[in-house]
């Protein structure tokens, strides 16, 4: 029975593929909940909040890696390389892109969109720890799950084009929150699929999730941790830039600038670069 279930290469209707993908997402949720519980327990002993933030990040990564790697090796009986989870070093090009992309988006808003810049200098060490943790945890866990595990499963059952799109759509859907209008959701789906395809393209470019881990992690570090750009002043980031604009293509709607047009254009440019790198590598 189990041998039939894990025979992912022989999945006529795709049911097994979907179930394995759902299992991966469940393991991700379990890891995060467990990390939060452990961190909460430790907060009764450790009073320094910045340490708790870093510990929660480390636990999230550790628990998820243990669960997903255990399931891949013992459950699916596959090697990690099969899912592009390997020790290939991140490309210097994509390391550079990971820095240029968020800096260009931040620069666009600062130089071309009117707003008010402020420094959240209260508990700066906590904000820096938050920036590091949100970059590391999302970069490592989400990329191994979506661009490593799920993308390969979908690729086996269907093809690479669908594999690049489907995890990206799921990735976008998981970011939908309450209070969003239809326009907000559509805009989030457009940008979410674009950023997901970008991470997928970056992974395919050198056949490793390590590139997308770097691009995703550095993006979160700068956009969500260091510089909070939104209509209202962001107190969680180190720097806050409150923009004065009602244009949803600039503000990104309720989700924020990650679903705005400037960021989406950036995703598109990186996708083209990744495709070119892939083409040159295979030529």
Which functions belong to the PLM regions below?
Residues 2-5, 39-54, 75-144, 151-152, ...:
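Juxtamembrane helix-loop-helix connectors linking adjacent transmembrane helices
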Residues 102-107, 135, 139, 160-176, ...:
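Small-polar-interrupted transmembrane alpha-helices in polytopic inner-membrane proteins
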Residues 114-121, 176-185:
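Membrane-interface helix caps and helix-loop-helix hairpins in membrane proteins
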Residues 141-166, 170, 201-211:
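Membrane-interface helix/loop boundary segments of multi-pass membrane proteins
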């Amino acid at each position: 029975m189990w041998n039939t279930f894990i025979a992912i290469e022989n999945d006529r209707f795709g049911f097994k593929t979907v179930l394995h993908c759902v299992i991966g997402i469940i393991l991700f949720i379990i890891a995060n909940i467990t990390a939060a519980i452990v961190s909460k327990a430790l907060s009764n002993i450790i009073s320094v909040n910045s340490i708790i933030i870093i510990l929660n990040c480390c636990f999230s990564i550790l628990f998820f890696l243990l669960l997903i790697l255990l399931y891949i090796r013992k459950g699916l009986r596959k090697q990690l390389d099969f899912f592009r989870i390997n020790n290939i070093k991140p490309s210097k090009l994509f390391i550079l892109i990971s820095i240029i992309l968020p800096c260009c988006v931040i620069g666009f808003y600062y130089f071309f969109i009117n707003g008010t810049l402020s420094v959240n200098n209260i508990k700066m060490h906590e904000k820096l720890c938050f920036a590091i943790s949100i970059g590391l945890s999302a970069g490592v866990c989400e990329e191994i799950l979506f661009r490593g595990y799920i993308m390969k499963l979908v690729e086996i059952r269907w093809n690479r084009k669908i594999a690049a799109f489907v995890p990206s759509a799921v990735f976008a859907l998981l970011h939908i929150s309450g209070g969003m209008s239809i326009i907000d959701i559509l805009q989030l789906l457009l940008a979410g699929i674009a950023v997901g395809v970008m991470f997928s393209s970056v992974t395919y470019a050198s056949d490793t999730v390590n590139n997308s881990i770097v691009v995703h992690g550095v993006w979160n570090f700068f956009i969500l941790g260091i510089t909070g750009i939104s209509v209202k002043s962001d107190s969680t980031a180190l720097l806050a830039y409150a923009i004065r604009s009602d244009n949803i293509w600039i503000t990104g709607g309720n989700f924020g600038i990650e679903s705005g047009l400037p960021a989406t254009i950036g995703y598109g440019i990186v996708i083209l670069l990744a495709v070119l790198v892939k083409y040159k590598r295979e030529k």
